[in-house]
UniProtKB/Swiss-Prot annotation:
Cofactor(s) required for function per UniProt: FAD
Binding site for FAD: 82-110, 360-373
Any Gene Ontology biological process: abscisic acid biosynthetic process
Identification of the protein by name: Zeaxanthin epoxidase, chloroplastic
Length: 661
């Protein structure tokens, strides 16, 4: 006996169709297992002042004699070289850790570690790719293990580029194979706050002076004095400027040199949202004309997204207007984009203009050098900005250690300047190439055109003919050939410089057995979607109808008609409308896909995709439909939107359906 669902204009809770928002405080997204409060009694003495209070969350650091800079751990032979680091971001902390592990005295000056330097909030979680994880392993295996444990693995799934409107795959990236073949860790995504706290704890609270903003320095030849915003001075043997894209150290080295505006502003947010394909897809870049959108799994049932839009810098949104503006900008795009926007609270959306810096040949002078964004700030499209800073930190510590060993062998003073130039020379070419790749990736993502006519104004009518744009076709051929080589070099090109690290992979990083099949077969990837399929009313005559949860039992199809049919096998769905025939259509399931069969209905059955292509289903012939398609029963007035969701039916009614039309 079939179970029957009646469809009419019965009242249904408005919650089913509400656009639910989820409160997502950025600073609570990734709780850590260790205490957020760190205390220190680290003492340094200023040349001008004493007794000043500092704080790192709740860190106190009084000023004492420079000669009382904490020594290296007992397990490491101290090396009489004091290194001053301007900036306690990821690059500065990684270098400080690497230098500390080599036995050097290190002091890190950070203007506001407790706020993740502001940029951590704007830039959200950070992708630590295989090359950077390997460098962390070479620096400190325990720290690398903790980062990989706290982070969310994305490299074991499909990643790549998709069409922003249709949601279809353009190019897939294989970041798993290059890592495994070279014995590297698999790419992770981790909260910036979590990463910074892991690094700060490993560096040691006694080494970091918070609330200390380096604004200038004096290179005295064999010594360097740093000058803080409050007038205090500290002396060291060298200075590393790791103070970000707006670096004061860089400015004082080379004069004022404006950062380059990318042409894009970026909105970012985190949503409590789990896509139906979470087990098979790690991150996606949705391509469009003068705009693009990036989404990534960051673990813990959350998704991070970035929305890029071409416009002049300095724009300001109206109060509580960011989300509304984004929904207008990305109107008509696929559900993967719109659902994330709808699931994000207004207060969780942040905006910043994107800048980078053109690579320069000279990174430093004398006993001063630069590291990370202070010298090679990149656009975020490659996910390699932080990774390059980590590689910088490893290489700089290595070159200083080589100089120290040479000094010990020859009995001569450490040649600090030569070691800094050696570091700069070893990093310059690789960083410049990846910087250029990041710019090129932004250009490609925002100039993508699916069909002829896109962006052509009066000729935009050509898009209805769906003639593939030549750039799209040629670009795909090029990327298919170049991407494997590029990824292999980006992820593994620095491995030979990691002294003492043995190539190795973790069994826990094992990918799905279907990964290779998913790369080669879009259909197999779609069939792997693990979620509930729903038909959501979107027609004029059935807005108040209940949603339909489709049955994945191959032996029990759904029968749609104007009246219930208790004498058929399966679920009978009754839609008492004049356009619906008594026995109108059947929805069946087979091998991970759903099919719609018209049962010789009087008014016909149609399927329309998200791009507007509409066709009539032939009688008695099963036609496959896909997520985001619209199914019309008899006419456009009785229509349903196909949606696949990870949520159970109970939570769907509780939280509300997202985009339904």
């Amino acid at each position: 006996m079939a179970s029957t669902l009646f469809y009419n204009s019965m009242n249904l809770s408005a919650a089913v169709f509400s656009r639910t928002h989820f409160p997502i405080p950025i600073n609570k997204d990734f709780p850590l297992e260790f205490s957020p409060c760190i205390h220190t009694d680290y003492h340094l003495r200023s040349r001008t002042r004493s007794g000043q209070k500092k704080c790192l969350t709740e860190v106190r650091a009084t000023v004492a004699s420079p000669t009382e800079v904490p020594s290296a751990p007992a397990s490491t032979q101290p090396k009489k070289l004091r290194i001053l680091v301007a900036g306690g971001g990821i690059g500065g902390l990684v270098f400080a850790l690497a230098a500390k592990k080599k036995g050097f005295d290190v002091v890190v000056f950070e203007k506001d570690l407790s706020a993740v330097r502001g940029e951590g909030q704007y830039r959200g979680p950070i992708q630590i790719q295989s090359n950077a994880l390997a460098a962390l392993e070479a620096i400190d295996m325990d720290v690398a293990e903790e980062v990989m444990r706290v982070g969310c693995v994305t490299g074991d799934r499909i990643n790549g580029l998709v069409d922003g409107v249709s949601g279809t795959w353009y190019v897939k990236f294989d970041t798993f194979t290059p890592a495994v073949e070279r014995g590297l860790p698999v790419t992770r995504v981790i909260s910036r706050i979590a990463l910074q706290q892991i690094l700060a704890r490993a560096v040691g609270e006694e080494i970091i002076i918070n609330d200390s903003n380096v604004v200038n320095f004096e290179d005295l030849g064999d010594k360097v004095n740093v000058i803080l915003e409050n007038g205090q001075r500290y002396e060291g043997d060298m200075l590393v400027g790791a103070d970000g894209i707006w670096s004061k150290v860089r400015k004082n080295l080379f004069g004022l040199n404006e950062a380059v505006y990318s042409g894009y502003t970026c909105y970012t947010g985190i949503a409590d949202f789990v896509p139906a394909d979470i087990n098979s897809v790690g991150y996606r870049v949705f391509l469009g004309h003068k705009q693009y959108f990036v989404s990534s799994d960051v673990g813990g049932g959350k998704m991070q997204w970035y929305a890029f839009h071409k416009e002049s810098p300095g724009g300001v949104d109206s109060p509580n207007g960011k989300k509304e503006r984004l929904l207008k900008i990305f109107e008509g795009w696929c559900d993967n984009v719109i659902d994330l926007l709808l699931a994000t609270e207004e207060d969780a959306i942040l905006r910043r203009d994107i800048y980078d810096r053109t690579p320069i040949l000279t990174w430093g002078k004398g006993h001063v050098t630069l590291l990370g964004d202070s010298v090679h700030a990149m656009q975020p499209n490659m996910g390699q900005g932080g990774c390059m800073a980590i590689e910088d930190g490893y290489q700089l510590a290595l070159e200083l250690d080589k100089a120290w060993k040479k000094s010990s062998e020859t009995g001569t003073p450490v040649d600090v300047a030569s070691s800094l130039r050696s570091y700069e020379n070893s990093r310059r070419l690789r960083v410049a190439i990846i910087h250029g790749m990041a710019r090129m990736a932004a250009l490609m993502a925002s100039t993508y055109k699916a069909y002829l006519g896109v962006g052509l104004g009066p000729l935009s009518f050509l898009t209805k003919f769906r003639i593939p744009h030549p750039g799209r076709v040629g670009g795909r051929v090029f990327i298919d050939k170049a991407m494997p080589l590029m990824l292999s070099w980006v992820l593994g090109g620095n491995s030979s410089k990691l002294e003492g690290r043995s190539p190795s992979c973790r069994l826990s990083d094992k990918a799905s057995d279907q990964l290779r099949n998913w790369f080669e077969d879009d259909d197999a990837l779609e069939r792997a979607i693990d979620g509930e399929w729903y038909l959501i009313p979107c027609g004029q005559d059935n807005d108040a109808s209940q949603l339909i949860c489709l049955n994945r039992d191959e032996k029990n199809p759904c029968i749609i008609g104007s009246a219930p049919h208790g004498d058929v096998s399966g679920i009978s769905i009754a839609i008492p409308k004049p356009q619906v025939s008594e026995m109108h259509a059947r929805i069946s399931y087979k091998d991970g896909a759903f099919y719609l069969t018209d049962l010789r209905s009087e008014h016909g059955t149609w399927i329309a995709d998200i791009e507007g292509k509409r066709y009539r289903v032939p009688p008695n012939f099963p036609a496959r439909f896909r997520p985001s398609d619209a199914i019309e029963i008899g006419s456009q007035k009785v229509a349903f939107r196909v949606k696949v969701m990870k949520s159970s039916p109970g939570s769907v009614e509780k939280e509300g359906i997202l985009q339904a039309a």
